[in-house]
């Protein structure tokens, strides 16, 4: 789709097809913004804009679960760590927080907790500031700081140990003897230090930082710790990571006090609440005082105080159920459209983009905005040369809310004529039934789509080939050094024996740069199965669903063989995939269609012969219910459906939604219904709630 005006979106009235279009669009936008924010330290939009984008995605996915894997940002945390830093695997995942934007969201947060825990009162909640900085994890072993890392993608972060040590107030030893003790917090720069730092940058002729958060992130992620040491970095800690002493604190309130006693910097402006009224009152007071604070905050955080309740509540794949961030509202800006261009995505979607006179809204410079589709341009009568209003609050991207008609120059404003053919290959554009996005169907020959697919293949979430950015990919394609993905891995050999114009002789490349690129390409030949599957850019297969497929097929050979059988209408494989929660019908259909195209099969065959694709390794395979598919049906007396599902997942089980031949166990509550009958017919093991609880306790 080319447009996403959420002021006209009523989620309750969305059809599945329309919802799919929106989620398709969100995947592209979120991926672009993640790259800019986490990896480049150069955000294209504000946190508020991004939050609403992701929030809309999550709400649609909640209503249409089968769309969860059209884009996997409902499952995503952070961004892939930079290849410039060594990697650190988090012993305990660093999840992001779910976001709330109104009182109703916070009220729903409390209600969900009550339903999950089966209680009728609000548990005690700690209310804290949400510091706008860079998240970090610091590990102490027997009281000595041994490792520090950024959040990264939540599972793997960047090693910033030496850089963190340059923050003078950060303890490098603790008066404890625990084998492992990890603290988590936020690195930031005060507003005053930020202004001074930018003055220094300007005097040195260096680029200015757009806001304190980016200054902090850029400073702690320096390759040279000596540079970091010159920056006025500060920090707050507010949580634990992996610990061997699980009795260090029993509540969040106690934890903050004990961390302060250990001489960590802890923001002391927190309260303990047990009702919605005081929680909102805290938010309102903080919002009033926000501009008087020495540092940037972008909201408040509510956390269930009792750690035992936190453990019961658990987490989704991206965020804990026991916490939520109540974000501050966003702002409005006005600027001029200088041009409207078209971009072609890897699936052929043709999207108009408005180029703007750069405008700074809440510290973030915005220079373009997606117009989504032809209908938006026409309905809002948007023209090149118009002054437009950018609205952030409640919108999913830097959205053009409307045209300032009073400022329109009728002599110079220019209507944008949406083309009927692809701007890349001149193929006729089509709008599929139920969609508003115009698409180019020439996927195998359209250079724009080939370019986007190659960019996706080498991206950090896929094969992560550092040094092969978009400009270089475009250069290689334009000059026929490569034609397709496979050619990337032939680049070094062809450069030696085939190309008359060697890459190292081209301006802007150089021998060191080229050799480093070849080294990175060779390193990328060793890839794990789920990243290989994701890199293929199969429609509806995001990072999360790629992991599910890798877990199912285990090896590249089996993935290909089973997918080819699927393409030949193997019903058993199709049924198995559609019944995997998180895969489903849409992904199974697209996997089948992908392998029905001979060019795709040829591509994969060549890649398999070039790459070393590691078999799937699941860290939870040693859990007691690993590889078991369990289905729950009916209502349960002692625990909620959500909690009983979490119990199973913590033990390594895969929770299914339908009973099939792949089901290992059915757990029945009251009013079990048709699933019980089907399980009996298939001879599947059946236990009741009491038996389940007994089994879990014994495990």
From Swiss-Prot:
Record key words, sorted: DNA damage, DNA repair, DNA replication, Ligase, Magnesium, Manganese, Metal-binding, NAD, Zinc
EC number: 6.5.1.2
Full protein name: DNA ligase
Family per record: Belongs to the NAD-dependent DNA ligase family. LigA subfamily.
The organism's taxonomic lineage, starting at the top: Bacteria, Pseudomonadati, Pseudomonadota, Alphaproteobacteria, Rickettsiales
Active site: 130 (n6-amp-lysine intermediate)
A biological process from GO: DNA replication
Keyword Metal-binding attached: yes
SUPFAM superfamilies named in the record: BRCT domain, DNA ligase/mRNA capping enzyme, catalytic domain, Nucleic acid-binding proteins, RuvA domain 2-like
Molecular function terms, GO-annotated: DNA binding; DNA ligase (NAD+) activity; metal ion binding
Native source organism of the sequence: Orientia tsutsugamushi (strain Ikeda)
